[in-house]
């Protein structure tokens, strides 16, 4: 199936202006490169007189609100388009702009070089003509999803690019390659995206109009049903008690009575200024001390921020340095007054608040006589308890009966144990039954392989250990006594040396005959 396109119908001013606006917005969308000194404008647009050949190869789906088909398009006409812009001819400015974007932040302070920052723009007219297109595409249309256009191949065969820089062959070749690459990207990505967005735009208008008509119709029906006295749903929507309470609360605010009923836990907006006026804060102190802060900025900052912090906005927005300096000085005075205390006699003199200090002194105070008496009594009592524990029960009971110890309210001290306390305890305690009783099982003494004898330990020295000071000796020191003792031992070994024993035979020469070792150990 093929179609004949009436190409002359496109030669209208309305379509030409609409196409120019569409192309201008599409070319200037996004961030422009630094090499361009101005925006791109459409200088000339002409559709030509030769129409393209459009042929439908296949229709996959056809319906009232959807369509899917494959088509073929061929064009070799006289369409031409002229673009106008200004190009940056200063390479230092281009390099500076690129480095600011990629490497350096815009807030970074850089030297202002006149040569690198000066713009040198050159006008550029770019003409596109002799376009040859041959491609196969797929069209999918849906009323809900819009129109989608996709090309199976690269539709651009050739294009002629002419500009004001054609005399420079290097620039002409560069522009030719760049324009061809951009047009191929246009057919592959940009054109399908634009067609899809515009189709959604027009389809959404139709859908919105239908939705508005349906909404108005439903609202008119609900309004008429709400006015119907026979509708039982209205009885459950609003309660008469709630309406009476709301009406009573509304009427209380429309009276001139001084005794207005209050709500619990609520601050009314009419009384909010009185509540925040006496609230201690840094901003209130600044407003009272400095009359330079206007009421408008005070109310704006006080309503926006409820914190008790430093009003940074008042300092940043103010361009007067002297005024900002006075505000900062007043803030420091307020903070210092809150830290230091004023003396009662003179208000100008301030007193630094006392801080809690802990002293770690090395000197020990002399103990009072009462404390020494208490400690001595407690020491005697501890000795008495240790003696009583080591003595028999009868003697301890007699001593306790004869002497009555008074109650001492003093810090307890650890009891000193005699050196032989552990040995005496082991001797006094009888052996347990399981050491002597025999039971059936592995071994004896009911699996208790430990001996019943007490553990022998070295006696604890009664006298404190004395520190013997050893004299330091040099590395070359020779102990004569050790040398003499070693020589005596060697002489005794030589004199008492016996004949060499023969372990291979049964008998060997020795004063004390020894039996030869068994055969495996014979030499």
UniProtKB/Swiss-Prot annotation:
InterPro entries: Mdm34, SMP_LBD
UniProt entry tagged with the keyword Membrane: yes
Domain SMP-LTD: 1-200
Domain of life: Eukaryota
GO biological-process terms attached to the record: mitochondrial genome maintenance; mitochondrion-endoplasmic reticulum membrane tethering; phospholipid transport
Keywords: Lipid transport, Lipid-binding, Membrane, Mitochondrion, Mitochondrion outer membrane, Transmembrane, Transmembrane beta strand, Transport
Chain spans, region Disordered: 489-523
Membrane topology value: Multi-pass membrane protein
CDD domains per UniProt: SMP_Mdm34
GO molecular function: lipid binding
Cellular component terms (Gene Ontology): ERMES complex
Subcellular location, principal: mitochondrion
Location relative to the cell: Mitochondrion outer membrane
UniProt free text on domains: Lacks alpha-helical transmembrane segments, suggesting that it resides in the membrane via beta-sheet conformations similar to those predicted for other outer membrane proteins and porin. The SMP-LTD domain is a barrel-like domain that can bind various types of glycerophospholipids in its interior and mediate their transfer between two adjacent bilayers.
Family assignment from sequence similarity: Belongs to the MDM34 family.
Subunit structure: Component of the ER-mitochondria encounter structure (ERMES) or MDM complex, composed of MMM1, MDM10, MDM12 and MDM34.
Role description: Component of the ERMES/MDM complex, which serves as a molecular tether to connect the endoplasmic reticulum (ER) and mitochondria. Components of this complex are involved in the control of mitochondrial shape and protein biogenesis, and function in nonvesicular lipid trafficking between the ER and mitochondria. MDM34 is required for the interaction of the ER-resident membrane protein MMM1 and the outer mitochondrial membrane-resident beta-barrel protein MDM10.
Name the record gives this protein: Mitochondrial distribution and morphology protein 34
Species this protein is from: Scheffersomyces stipitis (strain ATCC 58785 / CBS 6054 / NBRC 10063 / NRRL Y-11545)
Higher taxonomy: Eukaryota, Fungi, Dikarya, Ascomycota, Saccharomycotina
């Amino acid at each position: 199936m093929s179609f004949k396109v009436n190409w002359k119908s496109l030669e209208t001013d309305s379509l030409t202006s609409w196409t120019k606006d569409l192309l201008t917005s599409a070319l200037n969308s996004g961030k422009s490169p630094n090499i361009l000194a101005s925006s791109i404008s459409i200088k000339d647009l002409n559709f030509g007189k030769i129409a393209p050949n459009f042929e439908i190869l296949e229709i996959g789906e056809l319906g009232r609100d959807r369509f899917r088909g494959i088509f073929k398009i061929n064009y070799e006409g006289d369409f031409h388009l002229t673009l106008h812009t200004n190009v940056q001819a200063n390479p230092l400015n281009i390099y500076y702009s690129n480095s600011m974007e990629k490497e350096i932040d815009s807030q970074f302070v850089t030297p202002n070089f006149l040569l690198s920052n000066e713009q040198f723009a050159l006008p550029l007219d770019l003409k596109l003509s002799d376009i040859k297109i041959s491609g196969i595409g797929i069209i999918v249309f849906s009323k809900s999803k819009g129109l989608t256009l996709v090309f199976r191949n690269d539709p651009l065969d050739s294009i002629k690019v002419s500009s004001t820089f054609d005399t420079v062959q290097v620039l002409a070749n560069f522009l030719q390659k760049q324009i061809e690459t951009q047009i191929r990207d246009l057919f592959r990505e940009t054109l399908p995206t634009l067609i899809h967005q515009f189709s959604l735009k027009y389809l959404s208008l139709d859908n919105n109009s239908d939705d508005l008509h349906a909404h108005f119709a439903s609202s008119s029906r609900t309004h008429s049903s709400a006015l119907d006295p026979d509708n039982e749903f209205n009885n459950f929507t609003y309660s008469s008690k709630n309406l009476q309470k709301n009406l009573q609360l509304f009427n209380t605010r429309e009276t001139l009575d001084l005794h207005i009923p209050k709500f619990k836990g609520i601050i009314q907006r009419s009384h909010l200024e009185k509540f925040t006026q006496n609230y201690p804060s840094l901003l209130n102190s600044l407003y009272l001390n400095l009359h330079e802060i206007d009421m408008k900025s005070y109310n704006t900052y006080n309503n926006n921020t409820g914190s008790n912090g430093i009003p940074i906005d008042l300092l940043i927005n103010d361009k007067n340095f002297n005024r900002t300096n006075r505000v900062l000085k007043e803030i420091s005075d307020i903070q210092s007054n809150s830290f230091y205390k004023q003396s009662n006699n003179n208000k100008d003199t301030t007193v630094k608040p006392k801080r809690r200090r802990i002293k770690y002194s090395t000197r020990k105070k002399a103990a009072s006589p009462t404390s020494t008496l208490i400690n001595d009594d407690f020491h005697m009592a501890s000795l008495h308890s240790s003696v009583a524990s080591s003595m028999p029960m009868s003697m301890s009971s007699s001593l306790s009966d004869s002497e009555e110890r008074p109650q001492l309210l003093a810090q307890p001290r650890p009891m000193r144990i005699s050196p032989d306390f552990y040995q005496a305890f082991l001797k006094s305690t009888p052996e347990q039954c399981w050491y002597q009783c025999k039971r059936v099982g592995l071994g004896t003494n009911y699996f208790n392989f430990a001996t019943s004898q007490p553990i022998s330990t070295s006696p604890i020295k009664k006298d404190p250990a004395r520190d013997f000071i050893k004299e330091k000796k040099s590395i070359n020191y020779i102990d004569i006594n050790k040398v003499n003792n070693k020589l005596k031992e060697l002489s005794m070994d030589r004199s008492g040396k016996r004949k060499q024993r023969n372990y291979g035979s049964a008998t060997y020469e020795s004063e004390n005959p020894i039996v030869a070792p068994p055969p495996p150990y014979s030499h």
